[in-house]
């Protein structure tokens, strides 16, 4: 079965319309049909005969259409009779037409002769409508009872009156002799994949090809409806509307509702633009409030900030739940007790979190205050102090700023100026010793077999090279910048290797890597090497790194003098356990507290160390003991040694420097240098009542 769109598109050749047999009468003759099979715009006989017989029901019309599409005609219509009936149907179908929106066929009067019909039939193109000839059946050119086409879109014509018989004698007689007959219907030979099908289906209008309709005669009263509308006008919906109206009413309503609900969607033709209104957040909120009846009020800014600062972020995920269904339910007393315990736990958790929030807030305020002071101090250092270094370095104002800590942007410069360059090392000299170190590293593996027969100094130097590689990997391991593959690994290795070539009498000692690493973080490579070499050339560092026992003994004895002066109770506690200063001071002095304290705090210790010299190193040690005095008094020997070799990581600079400031580096009007000189004299005279670890 062919649909409206299929029947409306003709194939390559013009097929003949098959005559549709009408209902048979009692005398064996065909009863003329009153309308087309669509119930619409096609009338097969003059209007004066329309009222004589009722129109067949839609089911019978559909059966006729299917019978015509099936092929052979009903019995009773032979070949000649079919031809005569087809020829007689031409004048009646002259003025009536149907579009492909109705049934896919258009019936018109054939005014061609046999030769013209045959030529048109074999032309290979679809037969389109032609303009009507003037003066036929009235002034209008069409029959008076014919109605114009209702829908001219995508129309095509199927000719009637020609047969497939090539014999001219069997064809319809030439001219227009027959005036009334039953219309002949048939199906086109539609090839759905052809180009013609596509072209015909895309036709937008065929108004210029349709014959002009003349004035139609009024129908009898039987055909008139209320308001003067004709039955043909009421049934002018077309063949598709016939199926939708009689067979698929629900489906049609659904389709119409879909079309109305989605105006932006159209299956064929141009799609109209859909309205796309951008809704703001305010409009969305208003729609939500109107739909739910709720109003969303934002909290004030001040309250949100206060709750963020003071309210706990969580309740440590404490959730009170009932027992699983497979276990016995709680009793009322047990449920109340659990609820009370839960409330107490949540309250404690909130108190703890509020306390931590206050602590974090206090730390942030202190850090912010410190950053502001550093920013203001940086301007003073850059614009006033550094340009006039030699004049202002000893002034009271500069010393106070120095005590508060150097800004990181000027720290390296101030360190270089404070340490000085008594050794007169230049960047070119550093390159020379660095090249020597590289040559030694290169020849180390090649000459390893010859080192057994050489002197002790060569073995010590080789041991220093191996120790450098091992010690670099343990330098600030939490930063991951000095280990192999880090950005400062090669720089640290170069500085330490160049120093072993520059001072072969000292070589490399464990702890040097931390000092060099701190300098690298604040200075360029050549400047870091210059500061490193001059810093290790100081008397205290040189005594410790060269492991000069006598000098180390003097420093320990001087430290104990000020220890007893400032922390007498803790000093006696250490004496009771025979705990000497060398147990904890060696590590602090070797690394200049860079390993024992946090890095930022160690840098601040270095700031004042560059101002005050070696005295501040021992004063810092006394400040640490004062900070943890109460804890150390409760410990024994083992725990004291473990605690002092690994200090707590939460130590703050404010607490430490407040304790350092409380240490008085005077003993009976004697300062550090005077006490150190007197202790050195006593040791020289043989009084060695000091650390037993250094006695020989």
Curated annotation (Swiss-Prot):
Which segments show compositional bias classed as Basic and acidic residues? 108-118
* Record PTM Phosphothreonine, positions in chain: 669
Modified residue annotations for Phosphoserine: 205, 236, 668
Subcellular localization = Endosome
Could you tell me which residues carry N-acetylmethionine? Answer: 1
This molecule's function is given as: RAB11A-binding protein that plays a role in neurite outgrowth.
Name recorded for this polypeptide: TBC1 domain family member 12
The species this protein belongs to is Mus musculus
Gene this protein is translated from: Tbc1d12
């Amino acid at each position: 079965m062919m649909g409206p769109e299929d029947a409306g598109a003709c194939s390559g050749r013009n097929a003949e319309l098959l005559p549709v047999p009408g209902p048979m009468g009692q005398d064996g003759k065909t009863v003329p049909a009153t309308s087309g099979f669509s119930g619409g715009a096609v009338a097969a006989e003059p209007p004066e005969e329309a009222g004589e017989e009722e129109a067949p029901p839609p089911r019978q019309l559909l059966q006729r259409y299917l019978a015509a599409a099936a092929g052979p005609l009903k019995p009773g219509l032979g070949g000649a009779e079919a031809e005569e009936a087809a020829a007689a149907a031409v004048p009646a179908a002259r003025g009536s037409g149907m579009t492909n929106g109705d049934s896919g066929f258009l019936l018109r009067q054939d005014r061609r002769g046999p030769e013209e019909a045959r030529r048109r039939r074999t032309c290979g193109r679809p037969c389109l409508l032609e303009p009507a000839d003037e003066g036929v059946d009235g002034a209008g050119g069409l029959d008076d009872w014919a109605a114009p086409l209702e829908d001219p879109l995508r129309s095509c014509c199927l000719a009637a009156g020609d047969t497939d018989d090539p014999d001219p004698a069997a064809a319809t007689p030439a001219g227009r002799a027959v005036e009334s007959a039953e219309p002949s219907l048939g199906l086109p030979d539609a090839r759905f994949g052809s180009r013609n099908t596509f072209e015909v289906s895309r036709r937008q209008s065929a108004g210029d090809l349709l014959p002009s309709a003349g004035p139609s005669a009024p129908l009898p009263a039987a055909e008139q409806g209320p308001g003067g509308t004709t039955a043909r006008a009421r049934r002018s919906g077309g063949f598709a509307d016939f199926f939708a109206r009689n067979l698929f009413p629900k489906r049609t309503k659904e389709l119409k509702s879909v079309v109305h609900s989605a105006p932006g969607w159209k299956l064929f033709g141009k799609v109209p633009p859909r309205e796309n209104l951008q809704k703001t957040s305010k409009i969305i909120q208003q729609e939500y409030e109107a739909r739910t009846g709720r109003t969303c009020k934002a909290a004030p800014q001040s309250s949100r900030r206060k709750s963020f600062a003071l309210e706990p972020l969580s309740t440590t995920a404490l959730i009170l739940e009932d027992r699983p269904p497979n276990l016995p339910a709680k009793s009322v007393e047990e449920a109340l007790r659990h609820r009370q315990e839960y409330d107490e736990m949540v309250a404690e958790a909130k108190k703890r979190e509020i306390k931590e929030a206050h602590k974090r807030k206090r730390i942030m305020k202190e850090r912010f205050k410190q950053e502001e002071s550093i920013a203001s101090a940086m301007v003073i250092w850059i614009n006033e102090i550094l340009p006039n270094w030699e004049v202002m370095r000893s002034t009271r104002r500069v010393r106070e700023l120095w005590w508060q800590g150097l800004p990181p942007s000027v720290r390296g410069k101030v360190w270089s100026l404070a340490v000085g360059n008594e050794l007169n090392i230049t960047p070119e000299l550093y390159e020379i010793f660095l090249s020597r170190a590289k040559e030694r590293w290169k020849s180390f593996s090649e000459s390893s077999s010859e080192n057994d027969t050489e002197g002790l100094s060569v073995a010590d130097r080789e041991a220093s090279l191996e120790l450098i590689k091992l010690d670099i990997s343990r330098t600030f391991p939490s930063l991951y910048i000095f280990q192999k593959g880090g950005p400062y690994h090669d720089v640290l290795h170069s500085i330490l290797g160049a120093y072993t070539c520059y001072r072969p009498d000292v070589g490399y000692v464990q702890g040097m890597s931390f000092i060099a690493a701190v300098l690298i973080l604040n200075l360029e490579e050549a400047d870091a090497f210059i500061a490193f070499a001059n810093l290790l050339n100081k008397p205290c560092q040189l005594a410790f790194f060269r492991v000069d026992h006598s000098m180390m003994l003097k420093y320990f004895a001087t430290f104990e003098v000020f220890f007893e002066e400032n922390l007498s109770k803790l000093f006696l506690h250490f004496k009771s356990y025979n705990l000497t200063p060398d147990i904890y001071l060696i590590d602090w002095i070797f690394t200049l507290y860079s390993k024992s304290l946090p890095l930022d705090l160690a840098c601040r210790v270095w700031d004042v160390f560059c101002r005050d010299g070696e005295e501040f190193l021992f004063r810092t040690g006394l400040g640490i003991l004062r900070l943890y005095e109460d804890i150390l008094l409760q410990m024994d020997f083992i725990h004291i040694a473990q605690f002092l070799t690994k200090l707590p990581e939460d130590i703050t600079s404010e607490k430490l420097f407040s304790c350092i400031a409380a240490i008085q580096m005077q003993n009976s009007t004697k300062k550090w240098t005077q006490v150190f000189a007197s202790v050195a004299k006593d040791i020289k005279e043989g009084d060695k009542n000091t650390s037993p670890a250094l006695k020989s």
